[in-house]
Structures are given as C-alpha cells and as structure tokens.
Swiss-Prot record:
Pfam families: NAPRTase (PF04095), NAPRTase_N (PF17767). Catalyzes the synthesis of beta-nicotinate D-ribonucleotide from nicotinate and 5-phospho-D-ribose 1-phosphate at the expense of ATP. GO terms for biological process: NAD biosynthetic process via the salvage pathway. Transiently phosphorylated on a His residue during the reaction cycle. Phosphorylation strongly increases the affinity for substrates and increases the rate of nicotinate D-ribonucleotide production. Dephosphorylation regenerates the low-affinity form of the enzyme, leading to product release. It catalyses: nicotinate + 5-phospho-alpha-D-ribose 1-diphosphate + ATP + H2O = nicotinate beta-D-ribonucleotide + ADP + phosphate + diphosphate. Gene3D superfamilies: nicotinate phosphoribosyltransferase. HAMAP family: NAPRTase. Keywords: Ligase, Phosphoprotein, Pyridine nucleotide biosynthesis. GO terms for molecular function: nicotinate phosphoribosyltransferase activity. This is Nicotinate phosphoribosyltransferase. The gene is pncB. The modification Phosphohistidine is found at H224. One of its GO terms (cellular component) is cytosol. Its EC number is 6.3.4.21.
C-alpha cells in the first residue's frame, strides 16, 4: 500500500533548514549579534490561507520544542568552518515565539518577524515549509508518496532520452527545495530517489537535516538578506555590497565562495565585484533574469579582469527544472563551470497540484527599510517605495516599466 505524503511533525529538527541560514547565522553571531531586523510573509498569488491560521500557529509552537541533539552537533563539528563558539551557541538555541506575530489582516494571512537578527534568522525556511505543508494537508489530503516518486522517474526518463551520456556525466544538480516543499516526506523521498537513480550528478542538498540523514553534502553560502541588511549596516549605501562581501571574506577566508549578484542588479553588483573579490570568490549565483544573458555578462567580467572563466563556477537557482538546466548547461558547456539548484520542481511537483507561491523577506534592518531590486521587475521587494527610489538613484539603476511589488 502506498504511503501518505504527510507526517505529524512538519519540521523535523533545527537542521531541517537551508544550509545558508547556518552559514549566515554564524557570521551574524560574530559581527552583528545585537542588530534588530523585521521580516514579512507574502503570498504572491493571493491564495486564501486564512483557514489554516490555527494549525500554522500550532506548528510554530512545535518549533520551540526543537534543539540540537548530540548527533547533530557531531555532524556540524565535521564542517571545518563551523567555529566552536557558534556550535556552542547553536547547542543552546531555541526558537522563541515572542519574535513571531501571526494574524489575519485585510482578509489575508499575516506573518511578521521582529527581533534580533541572530534569533530571527532561522525562522524563515521552517515557517515557509509549515505554511506550504499545512495548506497541502487541507487541499490535497489523499496525496501519496508514490505520486511524487513516479513523477520524478518520468523526469529521469526524459533526461536520459534527451541528454547524451557525456552530458549526463557533467550535469551537476542539487536539491534546493526545502522552503516550498509539498511536505517533508516528499522532500525526503525525492532525495532518496535522486541519490539512488538520478542519471546526472547529484552534488548535494541545501537541507542540512537530510544531508546528514542521507550522507549528502550540505550546500549553500549566502542569501539576499545578507546583502540587504548591509544597506543599513555599512557606512554608506553605495558601499553596502562591498561591506557585505568584505565581511563575508573576513568570516570565511575564501571558503563558501559563491556570491549572489541580483540584490540590487547584476550590473550594480559587477561594478563592485573587482579583481580582489573575483579572485577570492569561487563563483556567482543566478536568481533572476535571463540565465544565459546573465552568464555571458559574468564570463565577460571575468575575462576583462584577466581571470579564466573555467576556473570559476556559476550556480543557477531561479525557477529551474531539468529541461531548463540542460538548455543552460549546453549554452555554457566548456566556457565556465555550471551547477543547478532545483527547488519547487523537485519537491513540490505532483500532477494536478499547484505549489505555493510565497516569500518571507527581510523588510527592515536596524529600524530602517531594506530592499531587493533584482534583475526582474516582479521580484522587487520593499515596503518603502521612497527607499527603492533612493537605492535606484545611488546605484544608477533605471526605473523599470512595471511597478515594484510590495514585500
């Protein structure tokens, strides 16, 4: 008999999160332990989530029961850049509901976070996973694990037919699907199948809990929040990206060297990404805009700096599926190293089921607005249109034809 796609507990452990939340959390502990931040949840497609408020609140309370086990700490101790003081702090860490406010406002589910960055940072991924799974339990209660498994094998078959053995040997794919997963059990099953039968190279997962459980490499470096926060932490706004990269370099000394380019725009980022950073960082991550045009821009930048692009890696993570990944791989093969982080299309792709379209983003740091503009107008996020206008002015980013969406 096929098993249900759901289990009682949605978030399995403190490690049931994206690896980059831990890498950023360590940097926050060492550099900004007392900085306050604010975050807001947004359902992008207007779906009515109000009926699920009570269960979401219950699952948030269950989060507060979680703590690191001795086995979890042993796993993290094997990661060379996880420092002893951070692991001691993480061993004491507990989620605290005082920093989370859930309610119904203007007929919409509202989730806000407000508190010290150090104590709020780990909420994002489990909160999104909770909203997604609670909603899916109500809307699709009879979903079976076999449906997700069969769908994944269909994708493997397509890939085997459409890619050559040489291409498959070089096609590097990772699971980046924790935050919008259909359920924990689906993500676990998908990763099991990927590990056993993926015809390309499975290079790891962003989910630390499952990386430990399945003996995979945990993957991730930094998120938009790291660069956004520095808009209010650095001495001048124009220097905020440089301040974010500099702080990262001081923390990790050349490790965890994939930088995210589209917090303002890639053009604005590359203006700050000089020879020093370009040599020190291993590569760049794409998260908005045309992926091949973006890659051409990055390759050209490396070449202008006298750096061989084949010594660098581009990571793609923007709404990917296997056909898109194969197209990008073919366009760039032999010119620069590439890797693909696939999220929703792996962990929430079940026939007849629409995945969640939602975000939980930082809106303020140290009491002042922060923003993400990105390389796509629809991904712009900020509560304060005046700050977005100021950010555009400072970084010489032209106005886009479509209006910015509020965070």
């Amino acid at each position: 008999m096929s098993e249900s796609a759901f289990s009682n507990r949605i978030v399995q452990s403190l490690l049931d999160t994206d690896f980059y939340k831990l890498t950023m959390m360590q940097a926050v502990l060492h550099n900004y332990p007392n900085v306050d931040v604010e975050w807001e949840f947004r359902c992008r497609n207007g779906e009515d989530l109000r009926p699920y408020l009570g269960e979401i609140q219950h699952q948030i309370e269950l989060l507060c029961e979680l703590s690191l086990s001795p086995e979890h700490l042993v796993f993290l101790e094997r990661i060379t850049f996880m420092k002893p003081d951070f692991l001691r702090f993480l061993g004491l860490f507990r989620f605290n509901t005082r920093y989370v406010k859930t309610s119904i406002e203007n007929d919409e589910l509202c989730i806000r976070l407000h508190g010290p960055w150090l104590h709020v940072i780990l909420f994002e991924v489990p909160l999104l996973a909770i909203v997604s799974e609670v909603r899916n339990r109500h809307r699709y209660p009879d979903t079976l694990l076999s449906q997700a498994r069969d769908r994944l094998y269909d994708k493997f078959e397509w890939l085997t037919v459409n890619a050559t053995p040489d291409e498959l040997a070089e096609l590097k794919v990772a699971d980046f699907g924790t935050r919008r997963r259909f359920s924990y059990r689906v993500q676990e099953e998908v990763l099991n199948v990927l590990k056993l039968d993926f015809p390309g190279q499975l290079v790891g997962t962003s989910n630390v809990h499952l990386a430990r459980q399945l003996d995979l490499k945990p993957l991730g470096t930094m998120a938009h929040e790291w660069i956004m926060a520095h808009q209010q932490l650095g001495p001048r706004l124009i220097d905020s990206q440089i301040a974010a990269l500099d702080c990262w370099v001081r923390e990790y000394r050349g490790l965890l060297g994939i930088a995210l380019t589209d917090c303002i725009t890639t053009d604005a980022f590359l203006n700050d990404f000089d020879l020093y950073f370009a040599k020190l960082f291993d590569g760049l991550r794409h998260d908005s805009g045309d992926p091949v045009k973006w890659a051409e821009k990055c390759i050209s930048h490396y070449q202008k700096l006298g750096i061989d692009p084949m010594s660098k890696t581009l990571v793609f993570s923007d709404g990917l599926n296997l056909p898109k990944a194969l197209d990008i791989f073919r366009a760039l093969r032999g010119r620069i190293n590439v890797s693909f982080g696939i999220g929703t299309n792996l962990t929430a792709d079940i026939p007849g089921i629409a995945p969640m379209n939602m975000v939980l983003k930082m809106t303020a740091c140290a009491g002042q607005a922060v923003a993400k503009i990105s390389d796509e107008s629809g991904k712009t996020q900020c509560k304060d249109p005046n700050f977005v206008a100021y950010l555009r002015h400072v970084f010489k980013v032209p106005d886009l034809p479509s209006p910015a969406k509020p965070a």
